[in-house]
Amino acid sequence: MKSGSRRAAASCVRFRIARGTNLMDLATIFGYLLAWGALGYGAWHASHGAIAAYIKPGEILLVGGCALGATMASMPLHSIIGALKSFKKMLFSKDAHIEHLIKEMVGYAETARRDGVLALETVAREAPDPFLRRGLQLTIDGTDPEIIERIMRIEIESMLERHKHGKHFFASLAKFGPGCGLVACLTAQVAMFRNLGGDAAVIGAALAVALVGTLYGALLQNLIAGPIAEKLGLKSKEEAFAKEIILQGVLSIQAGNNPRVVEMQLMSFLSSGQQAAMPKAA
């Protein structure tokens, strides 16, 4: 194996280490801790420590079950399974550093420029990203650039379509939450009105249950499903952004562009601050 191929393969290993570490999405975790911590303190303060007044298992089952059932009824089973996988991926996502990705693509361009495109064959086999692996292999095979772009573009669009199902699941759950909270509220109010003229304590307890049901619906929308749907949408855009960089890098390598040109082209995806922080290719 040529020295250029060995260097590219070693670079690929470093890329695998940088991208392959599963990290809990700290922003998601800290965000939920902050939101629920603030809610818990507010409820504790408002109830003078009687936090148990906000815990109604029956209402949790009613609101959660109704919202989940309505969401499942609106989607096919494979989309629901995909949504759960997307949620797991959101929590334990691979930290893809765009700056590092650009650096690796420039390294591949240097190898192809110096030793020929065929020198990337080892890199293509060992590339950790299947999308990158396919792009490099198509380049090595001498595939027409228009066909390469068409194949890789279809894969990006298919990925985005799959991600839409994951976002749709949690967005639907958020949409149905307040309505199901209203159902819980009305259900409790029926019991309350049946006891009008009776024990005031019973009426008060029924009214409290009604309000808690409404609260659960709002929480499901704003502190559970809604943020997940938004985060899934953001993650999808980030992944598509990284794949677009890979696509443009592969096409530039296939065209035989100078590594400096490849670097400048891919750097245009970054902000001026990110560009200034990146070391220039030799």
Question: Which residue ranges define each predicted feature?
Answer:
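Helix-termination/interfacial motifs at the ends of transmembrane alpha-helices
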Residues: 30-33, 37-51, 157-235
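N-terminal amphipathic/basic-hydrophobic helices that include classical n-h-c signal peptides
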Residues: 1-23
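Large intracellular
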Residues: 12, 20-22, 26-31, 38-166, ...
